[in-house]
């Protein structure tokens, strides 16, 4: 056993500690924590919608009372879980900008960084196709969803939900890097000393915003030539990763890695779950709302693996409560 711990400490801890200390990883971890309240709020109203399945004997009662107002209160689910990519993008860009501001002593505004990240993400929402006749906004009609003026619509803007989380993170990091580069190299509009700080920061973001706009137009245009976009380009590899992590073998490997890190003094939950797994869980949860049956989604981990703490320590806690004695 000592050989195992020695191997983990010497071979596994150093690279994982380096990964955990990467600035964008730290920003994603913080973004994952800050978005938790929105998933909880959305889940509460989602449970209300499923009361007939939870308590079948009272199904007719719920249908005649609470569920009559479902279109009203379901807005809370749509605007929380259904918009989770927006929150992830804003939070990631905000915290990453804040990290650069503090660690590199740059004159950055975390709020401006968040807005630039959101701007970059929104530019990936519209679907455009380029042919011999030029560029056109996609228009399609399906049974469950449509694309109107380039925007995929279900009950809400589809790409604002879990399916857009990774693009939201990617564009947040990209926009923050552009903002940081412009400020670091002084490629900004400098205002006189007497101008209020808020106005000065607003004009300082103008050139980064222009660069981000041209950059996203270039990326969208290049991909539209091949009849795809960022979401379409990354959907296949991400779907493979989601399916892999959602398998029983994937779950076992992930949880084993988390607890091995705990065993050698590294916060395994923060390094593995909060940074990499939470976005995947949110995507799976969003799919479940639409009728999918992903097991590894939402609070599955907390209910069946982390109950009482990492390692399902509820039994140990109860044992300590009733059997432990003070020395």
Question: How would you label these PLM feature ranges?
Answer:
Residues 1-39, 59-263:
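Signature of multi-pass transmembrane helix bundles
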Residues 9, 13, 18, 24, ...:
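Loop-helix junctions at membrane interfaces
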Residues 40-56, 220-225, 285:
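Juxtamembrane "helix exit" motif at the C-terminal ends of alpha-helical transmembrane segments
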Residues 107-111, 268-273, 299-302, 327:
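The feature identifies polytopic integral membrane transport proteins across all domains of life
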Residues 112-120, 272-281:
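Central hydrophobic cores of alpha-helical transmembrane segments
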Residues 256-270, 320-321:
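Transmembrane alpha-helix interface/packing and boundary motifs in multi-pass membrane proteins
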Residues 265-274, 309-313:
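Transmembrane helix boundary and interhelical junction motifs in multipass membrane proteins
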Residues 278-327:
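Helix-loop-helix junctions within the multi-pass membrane cores of secondary transporters/permeases
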């Amino acid at each position: 056993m000592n050989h195992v711990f020695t191997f983990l400490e010497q071979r596994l801890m150093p690279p994982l500690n380096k990964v955990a200390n990467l600035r964008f990883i730290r920003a994603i971890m913080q973004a994952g924590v800050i978005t938790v309240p929105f998933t909880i709020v959305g889940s509460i109203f989602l449970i209300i919608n499923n009361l007939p399945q939870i308590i079948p004997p009272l199904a007719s009662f719920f249908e005649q009372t609470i569920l009559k107002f479902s279109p009203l209160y379901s807005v809370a689910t749509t605007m929380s879980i259904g918009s989770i990519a927006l929150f992830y993008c804003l939070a990631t860009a905000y915290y990453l900008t804040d990290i650069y501001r503090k660690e590199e002593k740059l004159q950055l505004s975390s709020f401006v960084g968040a807005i630039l990240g959101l701007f970059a993400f929104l530019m990936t929402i519209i679907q455009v196709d380029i042919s011999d006749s030029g560029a056109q906004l996609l228009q399609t009609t399906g049974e469950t969803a449509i694309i109107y003026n380039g925007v995929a619509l279900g009950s809400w803007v589809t790409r604002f939900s879990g399916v857009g989380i990774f693009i939201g993170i990617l564009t947040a990091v990209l926009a923050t890097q552009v903002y940081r580069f412009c400020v670091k190299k002084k490629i900004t509009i400098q205002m006189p000393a007497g101008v209020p700080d808020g106005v000065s920061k607003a004009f300082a973001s103008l050139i980064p915003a222009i660069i981000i706009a041209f950059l996203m137009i270039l990326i969208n245009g290049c991909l539209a030539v091949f009849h795809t976009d960022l979401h379409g380009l990354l959907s296949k590899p991400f779907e493979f990763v989601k399916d892999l992590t959602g398998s029983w073998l994937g779950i076992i490997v992930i949880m084993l890695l988390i607890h091995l890190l705990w065993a050698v003094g590294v916060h395994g939950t923060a390094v593995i779950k909060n940074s990499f797994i939470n976005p995947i869980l949110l995507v799976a949860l969003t799919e479940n709302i639409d009728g999918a049956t992903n097991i590894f989604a939402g609070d599955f981990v907390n209910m069946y693996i982390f109950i009482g703490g990492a390692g399902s320590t509820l039994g140990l806690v109860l044992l300590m409560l009733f059997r432990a004695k003070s020395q």
